[in-house]
Swiss-Prot record:
Entries under PROSITE patterns matching the protein: TPR, TPR_REGION
Subunit structure: Part of BBSome complex, that contains BBS1, BBS2, BBS4, BBS5, BBS7, BBS8/TTC8, BBS9 and BBIP10. Interacts with PCM1. Interacts with CCDC28B. Interacts with PKD1.
Keywords, alphabetical: Cell membrane, Cell projection, Cilium, Cilium biogenesis/degradation, Cytoplasm, Cytoskeleton, Membrane, Protein transport, Repeat, TPR repeat, Transport
Disordered, as annotated region: 89-109, 118-137
Transmembrane segments: none
Name by which UniProt lists this protein: Tetratricopeptide repeat protein 8
Residue stretches of each TPR repeat: 4-37, 225-258, 259-291, 292-325, 326-359, 360-393, 397-430, 432-464
Species of provenance: Mus musculus (Mouse)
Tissue expr: Isoform 1 is retina-specific whereas isoform 2 is ubiquitously expressed.
Primary location class: cytoplasm
Function: The BBSome complex is thought to function as a coat complex required for sorting of specific membrane proteins to the primary cilia. The BBSome complex is required for ciliogenesis but is dispensable for centriolar satellite function. This ciliogenic function is mediated in part by the Rab8 GDP/GTP exchange factor, which localizes to the basal body and contacts the BBSome. Rab8(GTP) enters the primary cilium and promotes extension of the ciliary membrane.
Length: 515
């Protein structure tokens, strides 16, 4: 079949079937017949088509969807020169954790991240970290659940300049960018678009891509919305958010597209204007009713603003439009679990299992839901599956930690002790396991060991209130009132509504007043 097809048609077929390497190799063979493959021959349309197709194939091999995947690196967080209001009005900022005024589960029930927001049901880039207050916190914050190392710069996920291009052919790069006459290419719209994407995504030369986009926009007399979106993307990568905002707004006036709404919302989110982003998404929904990506964007913002009830409503709207949306199902399931409805959560996680999601996290959640819904026959088998599917040490540590909770629930403290120790063997930065192990040691009467474990837990996770409160309680019992008071204050900072902490502080103040 292959020998009967024309080479260009076969290359196009490979491209459509996402066999990009085969497509690029075939285009290379076709271009080798002409003396130079640096630029397409003007009188040979086949050569020109092969050149464009090869550029597109090489771009697709390293292409990243920039709408969803967005990670702020340490460099972007700490060295950010954009001035943002330090004391924003409540409910208008993503940088400060909002208070839970929506009737959702409190911090005592639902664990929170370092940024002060509840842990989401679906791991997304940047949901783990938020914006750290200090460099030390930034370095300590894991980039995702899979690695403890923070991303140092957002450019780290883009291919290094020249690296990918050198790999594509042994003779050197496919296109020698320094020799390109951008003005000539900007006058050929079809060529210019393929070349722009190659320069931006494959070569990661944002400045040259911006130059080409500016010349092409000028040539189109500022009437082509596509080029305005691309200029906005370049400005966003360069950290020029206000300029990016202008370009995206101008593109939306000419042609309303879902992607443009999403790019503009990203700009508002990084400028810490979630309310503006919400209004923009709602404008988008007026133009594109029921669009899943816009509904999901609204739900994510509400979730980050600690408004779990509104987030759940929008995730339900997402499921009405697309009933196989994994993120929406996982987030609604998580919300039901922490709202003391494990049976309902179990239905959502089983739905994920039916859809073909088969990983450690899902079986871990199924095991917990089965236990709290009193379906004990399925609990341990789910955790066994989770352990067998764990891809790294952190995942195994989380499974052992949850098994420790099951052991506490059935009253087997020895098993719980072993499970928490195994969690620490797999991940010795697991603050929750240190805290729970300290409680078990305290019950055995090992006070000093419990205090040491609690100090470790509070230093690893200063945003958690439990280690601080437990340390304050232990110190109070052995008469170390000063340390007890300091720890209780830290607990109050972490969780101001915690009644037991307030009682302890009041009691300690009475002690100090009597001295």
């Amino acid at each position: 079949m292959g020998s009967e097809m024309e080479p260009l048609l076969r290359a196009w077929s490979y491209f459509r079937r996402r066999k990009f390497q085969l497509c690029a190799d075939l285009c290379t063979q076709m271009l080798e017949k002409s003396p130079y493959d640096q630029e397409p021959a003007p009188d040979l349309p086949v050569s020109q088509a092969a050149w464009i197709l090869k550029a597109r194939a090489l771009t697709e091999m390293v292409y990243i969807d920039e709408i969803d995947v967005d990670q702020e690196g340490i460099a972007e967080m700490i060295l950010d020169e954009n001035a943002i209001a330090q004391v924003p009005r409540p409910g208008t900022s993503l940088k400060l954790p909002g208070t839970n005024q929506t009737g959702g589960p409190t911090q005592a029930v639902r664990p929170i991240t370092q940024a002060g927001r509840p842990i989401t049901g679906f791991l997304r880039p940047s949901t783990q970290s938020g914006r750290p207050g200090t460099m030390e916190q930034a370095i300590r914050t894991p980039r995702t659940a899979y690695t403890a190392r923070p991303i140092t710069s957002s450019s780290g996920r883009f291919v290094r300049l020249g690296t990918a291009s050198m790999l594509t052919s042994p003779d050197g790069p496919f296109i020698n960018l320094s020799r390109l006459n951008l003005t000539k290419y900007s006058q050929k719209p079809k060529l210019a678009k393929a070349l722009f994407e190659y320069i931006l995504h494959h070569e990661n030369d944002v400045k040259m891509a911006l130059d080409l986009a500016s010349l092409s926009t000028e040539y189109s007399q500022y009437k082509d919305w596509w080029w305005k979106v691309q200029i906005g993307k370049c400005y966003y990568r360069l950290g020029m958010y206000r300029e990016a905002e202008k370009q995206f707004k101008s593109a939306l006036k000419q042609q309303e597209m879902v992607d443009t709404f999403l790019y503009l919302a990203k700009v508002y989110i990084i400028l810490d204007q979630p309310v503006t982003a919400l209004n923009l998404f709602k404008q988008g929904l007026d133009k594109f009713p029921g669009e899943v990506t816009l509904l999901c964007g609204i739900a994510r913002i509400y979730e980050e603003m600690n408004n779990s009830s509104s987030a759940a409503e929008y995730y339900k709207e997402v499921l009405k439009q697309d009933n196989t949306h994994v993120e929406a199902i996982a987030c609604i399931g998580s919300n039901h679990f922490y709202s003391d409805q494990p049976e309902v959560a179990l239905r959502f996680y089983r739905r994920l299992l039916q859809m073909g999601v088969y990983n450690c996290q899902l079986f871990n959640n199924l095991g917990l839901c089965c236990f709290y819904a009193q379906q004990y026959d399925m609990t341990l088998t789910s955790f066994e599956r989770a352990l067998s599917l764990a891809e790294n040490e952190e995942e195994a540590a989380d499974v052992w930690y949850n098994l420790g909770h099951i052991a506490v629930g059935i009253g087997d403290t020895n098993l719980a002790h072993q499970c928490f120790r195994l969690a620490l063997v797999h991940n010795n930065h697991h603050a929750e396991a240190y805290n729970n192990l300290a409680v078990l040691e305290m019950r055995k009467g090992h006070v000093e060991q419990a205090r040491a474990l609690l100090q470790t837990a509070s230093s690893l996770a200063p945003h958690m209130y439990e280690p601080h409160f437990n340390f304050a309680t232990v110190s109070d019992k052995i008469g170390d009132l000063q340390r007890s008071y300091v720890a209780a204050q830290k607990s109050e900072v972490a969780f101001p509504e915690h009644v037991d902490t307030q009682h302890l502080i009041k009691q300690l103040k009475q002690h100090f007043a009597m001295l």
